[in-house]
């Protein structure tokens, strides 16, 4: 009898350990690679939150193909660390794919590692041309691009801002300023091309390091050139610096059009003051003051964000990453497994029509694995809030002008 009990106990122990082992195998690991410290940490962390919320949602629904998604985090504080963290996540942690990364420079560096290793990399926030322009096999981008941002900036000027000011856009002088990384350089180049193609006059195109502490000479140059429209592609610190120093110098262009980054952040408005930023335009990812009939699921996303993080979303970066991750998870759930070629096949078959995501745009990968349905929107700061004013089907407010 004692022997039987021992055998039963041993068998039960083996069964339990087998169950635990099987459960451990039922986790699928993905890398979450964003700058969560350093100068890009604020928007890096905001972007990562979108991925985290998508993971929470898919796990609550039973995971992907019955497996729980586990995020393994890496900090892409600079390009070298982004590369090192990609190696660690792939070689030591054994992630099946990497999601990230917000910064164009960081993803360009890190994705070289994943490409050589044959591990899929899903970029959900960086806009530079070079991200997908290298023709990598395992890199996919779900979000809109620098070209989208530039085109929307110029279109908004021609179709909305100039008429609202009672001006012929061809009579207006445009100054283009930008932080000089891959992000700013790409957007500014497309802005210049789009403006010139439309017959507009660009009087200045000038880059600067994003960590600059003085933009007074650039403000002076814009003023001397007579720029009455300024397009700035920038992070938070340089957005704040330009707005403050332009104000101090008494330089008041007819319109300022931001290119996402710092111009989409509530902390930027709070830092410079709501009166100063009032009327400033912005071309960027879908934000939250938008016609929700064009963005199904956005309200639920905001509620989930507030429940998890205890505040309103700080910018549309979290939403864009959430939408991208959800789309990839949907594809993987319909796919055959988590081997690299199975993942690639699954996401290439993805076909989400426009108007069916919380960002408004659809998802279908085309040339160079870029989401060919991704688009941006036009916003304006009004009464301390960033509200959507363009295009018409997504707008909740009319453009305002200080004539």
UniProtKB/Swiss-Prot annotation:
Keywords assigned: Amino-acid transport, Signal, Transport
UniProt signal peptide: 1-26
Superkingdom in the source lineage: Bacteria
Keyword Transport among UniProt keywords: yes
GO biological process, one term: amino acid transport
Purpose of the protein: Component of an amino-acid transport system.
Similarity comment text for this entry: Belongs to the leucine-binding protein family.
Record's protein name: Leu/Ile/Val-binding protein homolog 8
Species this protein is from: Brucella abortus (strain 2308)
């Amino acid at each position: 009898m004692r022997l039987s009990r021992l055998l039963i106990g041993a068998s039960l122990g083996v069964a339990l350990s087998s169950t635990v082992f099987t459960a451990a195998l039922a986790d699928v690991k993905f890398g979450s690679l964003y700058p969560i410290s350093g100068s890009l940490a604020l928007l890096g962390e905001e972007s990562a939150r979108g991925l985290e919320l998508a993971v929470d949602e898919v796990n609550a629904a039973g995971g992907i193909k019955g497996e729980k998604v586990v995020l393994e985090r890496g900090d892409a504080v600079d390009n070298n660390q982004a590369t090192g963290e990609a190696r660690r996540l792939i070689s030591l942690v054994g992630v099946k794919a990497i999601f990230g990364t917000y910064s164009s420079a960081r993803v360009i560096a890190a994705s070289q590692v994943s490409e050589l290793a044959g591990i899929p990399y899903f970029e959900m926030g960086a806009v530079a041309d070079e991200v997908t322009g290298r023709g990598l096999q395992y890199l996919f981008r779900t979000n809109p691009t620098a070209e989208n941002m530039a085109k929307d900036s110029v279109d908004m000027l021609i179709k909305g801002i100039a008429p609202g000011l009672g001006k012929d856009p061809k009579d207006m002088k445009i100054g283009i300023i930008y932080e000089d990384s891959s992000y700013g350089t790409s957007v500014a180049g497309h802005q210049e091309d789009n403006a010139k193609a439309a017959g507009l006059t660009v009087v200045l195109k000038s880059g600067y390091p994003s960590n600059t502490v003085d933009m007074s000479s650039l403000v002076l140059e814009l003023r001397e050139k007579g720029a009455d429209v300024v397009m700035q592609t920038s992070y938070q610190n340089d957005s704040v610096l330009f707005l403050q120093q332009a104000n101090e110098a008494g330089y008041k262009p007819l319109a300022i059009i931001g290119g996402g980054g710092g111009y989409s952040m509530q902390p930027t408005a709070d830092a410079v003051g709501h009166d100063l930023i009032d009327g400033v335009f912005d071309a960027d990812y879908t934000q939250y003051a938008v016609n929700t009939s064009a963005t199904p699921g956005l309200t639920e996303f905001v509620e989930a964000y507030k429940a998890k993080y205890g505040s309103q979303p700080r910018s549309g970066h979290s939403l864009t990453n959430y939408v991208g991750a959800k789309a990839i998870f949907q594809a993987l759930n319909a796919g055959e497994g988590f081997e690299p070629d199975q993942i690639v096949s699954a996401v290439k078959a993805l076909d989400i029509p426009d108007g069916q995501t919380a960002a408004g745009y659809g998802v279908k990968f085309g040339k160079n694995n870029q989401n060919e349905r991704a688009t941006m929107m036009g916003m304006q700061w009004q009464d301390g809030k960033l509200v959507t004013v363009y295009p018409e089907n997504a707008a909740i407010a009319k453009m305002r002008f200080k004539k």
